[in-house]
């Protein structure tokens, strides 16, 4: 398979609203999986907490981490608002996610980070 970048990524909804639960949790999970698949990004582990998302992913070298995250957060915002139009009123200006994200490359710590998700 060649070189891939394994990253631990954390990002949150705007205003850290505790929105990721129930029907929204399943829908947001489907959207994020679909968008990762479209870009050839493999999800090793993922955890949807009420106010943020953790993902352990392999990103192909043709994608930069920042361009992938821009795509993931931007496109998923549009898809979330299409599926759940009522959320537009809480978030305004079509941005579901807050600015920025946390990322750390995994390297030799992959097993320890995977254990965190379990």
What positions do the PLM features span?
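Basic nucleic-acid-binding interfaces
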Residues: 1-118
């Amino acid at each position: 398979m060649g070189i891939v970048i394994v990253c631990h990524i954390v990002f949150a909804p705007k205003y850290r609203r505790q929105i990721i639960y129930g029907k929204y949790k399943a829908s947001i999970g489907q959207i994020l999986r679909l968008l990762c698949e479209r870009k050839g990004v493999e999800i090793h582990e993922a955890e949807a907490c009420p106010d943020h998302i953790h993902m352990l992913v392999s990103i192909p070298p043709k994608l930069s981490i920042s361009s992938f995250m821009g795509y993931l957060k931007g496109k998923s915002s549009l898809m979330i608002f299409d599926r759940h139009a009522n959320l537009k009123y809480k978030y305004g200006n079509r941005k579901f996610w807050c600015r920025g994200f946390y990322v750390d490359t995994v390297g030799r710590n992959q097993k320890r980070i995977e254990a965190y998700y379990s």
